[in-house]
Amino acid sequence: MKFVDEATLIVQSGDGGRGCVSFRRERFIPRGGPDGGNGGKGGDVVLVATRAKHTLYHFRYKHRFQAQRGGYGSGANRHGKNGEDLLIEVPVGTIVRDAETSEIIADLSVEEERCIVCHGGRGGKGNKHFTSSTYRAPRFAQDGEEGEEKTLKLELKLLADVGLVGLPNAGKSSLITALTAARPKIGAYPFTTLAPSLGVLQDPYGEPVVIADIPGLIEGAAQGAGLGHRFLRHIERNRLLIHLIDASQVTAEDPLASYQAINKELSSYDQALGEKPQIVVLNKMDLPEAEEGACLFKQSCGNLQVLQISAILGEGLDELIEAIFAQLREPGRRPS
């Protein structure tokens, strides 16, 4: 299924039902009073967060939704049936904005969390409601209130514990495949991954760890280059970043070039991203040039802790997994 992380919806709640004009008609009561019931309330439009969906793809072709209107009132003081609420499922991690003002209406970050985005119209009053000591036979009733209509902008931010970041072709897809059961597209050319993918790493002593493979960032991503804004926003909720570097591409002229480029983009987008804890990992240690590149990087990075792995061969992964669990178990690293 194609990953879609933005969608625009037009939603409308149900109109209230019309009140009824009716008079009591029974044997031996020739002049029964008014008995018109009220109309029913229109249905609300409710967004519901669910982990059963991981993308906004289901809104690609259907983007207009309307809740049920309220039923009409009837005689014998019978009220109209309330319209059913319309429940629209969205993935956990969806931010709901008013498309016209960009104001955030809701941040649905918890399973089964709900938000009423449009309230149904109130039902109209039947003619019985308008009787008085001086007006005993009103021959009119009230129309139901119109429902609300809104245009919503949905933005999905993945809820993952760990985010994999790095330049294109650093080996992020190979790493998430090696660590989890995820199966993203893998290739020996930049931008193989065009959308985030998720995998789950089982912690034998704690909760499962969700890892997100974030598509490769490029210079200018913080300003939107290469769909940078859409990729970077998925990192905002990560508790830990794995900063992956292709060791075979480290050069003597500027050993820290790729490392500094990614950190610059993170900080430019949001200072908080640049301050997130990172595990720096040199990948592709199976390639001939990687050993020299790793030495150059370590000589230039000072006291920075660096791990070396080969995602393709599975080398060094046990140490990386231990480092991930150790970081996430630290106080204050649990999700709020």
UniProtKB/Swiss-Prot annotation:
Major location (coarse): cytoplasm
Q: Which GO terms describe its cellular component?
A: cytoplasm
GO terms classed as biological process: ribosome biogenesis
Provide this UniProt record's keywords sorted from A to Z: Cytoplasm, GTP-binding, Hydrolase, Magnesium, Metal-binding, Nucleotide-binding
Q: Which domain of life is it from?
A: Bacteria
Q: What is its EC number?
A: 3.6.5.-
Cellular compartments annotated: Cytoplasm
Positions that bind Mg(2+): 173, 193
Give the coiled coil ranges. Answer: none
OBG-type G domain spans which residues?
A: 160-329
Query: What molecular functions are annotated in GO for this chain?
Result: GTP binding; GTPase activity; magnesium ion binding
Keyword Ion transport, does the record have it? no
- Which N-terminal residues, if any, form the signal peptide? none
Obg domain residues:
1-159
Pfam families for the chain: GTP1_OBG, MMR_HSR1
What is the documented function of this protein? An essential GTPase which binds GTP, GDP and possibly (p)ppGpp with moderate affinity, with high nucleotide exchange rates and a fairly low GTP hydrolysis rate. Plays a role in control of the cell cycle, stress response, ribosome biogenesis and in those bacteria that undergo differentiation, in morphogenesis control.
Q: How does it assemble?
A: Monomer.
Family membership, please give it.
Answer: Belongs to the TRAFAC class OBG-HflX-like GTPase superfamily. OBG GTPase family.
User: Under what name is this protein listed?
Assistant: GTPase Obg
Supply the source organism for this entry: Desulfatibacillum aliphaticivorans
